[in-house]
């Protein structure tokens, strides 16, 4: 019984690690496809582009006037 539980826990842990790696790789690929990124203070739209470059996030205080803001200033 202990062996079965240990095997089950090991399998679950292995699955979580593999999924985390797959998610990070997919995220990197998606970021690589974002060639039309804009920087600080420029207009952006997370749902359709242009997207904010790495280190920025799209802040929409009043639609449709969304602007890229620095991640460090959150």
Curated annotation (Swiss-Prot):
GO molecular function, one term: sodium channel regulator activity
Main location: secreted
UniProt keyword list: Amidation, Disulfide bond, Ion channel impairing toxin, Knottin, Neurotoxin, Presynaptic neurotoxin, Secreted, Signal, Toxin, Voltage-gated sodium channel impairing toxin
InterPro entries noted in UniProt: Beta/delta-agatoxin_fam (IPR016328)
UniProt KW Secreted keyword: yes
Organism superkingdom: Eukaryota
Location in the cell: Secreted
Gene Ontology, cellular component aspect: extracellular region; host cell presynaptic membrane
Signal sequence coordinates: 1-20
One protein family per Pfam: Toxin_7
Residue positions assigned to the propeptide: 21-34
Residue numbers of Serine amide PTMs: 72
Disulfide bridge map: 37-53, 44-58, 52-68, 60-66
Distribution of this protein across tissues and organs: Expressed by the venom gland.
SUPFAM superfamilies recorded: omega toxin-like
Family: Belongs to the neurotoxin 07 (Beta/delta-agtx) family. 02 (aga-3) subfamily.
Domain notes: The presence of a 'disulfide through disulfide knot' structurally defines this protein as a knottin.
Function recorded in the entry: Insecticidal neurotoxin that induces an irreversible spastic paralysis when injected into insects. Modifies presynaptic voltage-gated sodium channels (Nav), causing them to open at the normal resting potential of the nerve. This leads to spontaneous release of neurotransmitter and repetitive action potentials in motor neurons.
The protein, known as: U3-agatoxin-Ao1d
Organism of provenance: Agelena orientalis
């Amino acid at each position: 019984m202990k062996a079965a539980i240990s095997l089950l826990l090991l399998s679950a842990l292995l699955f979580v690690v593999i999924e985390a790696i797959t998610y990070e790789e997919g995220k990197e690929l998606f970021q690589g496809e974002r060639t039309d990124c804009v920087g600080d203070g420029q207009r952006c739209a997370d749902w359709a582009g242009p997207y904010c470059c790495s280190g920025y996030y799209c802040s929409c205080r009043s639609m449709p006037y969304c602007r890229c803001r620095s991640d460090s200033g959150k």
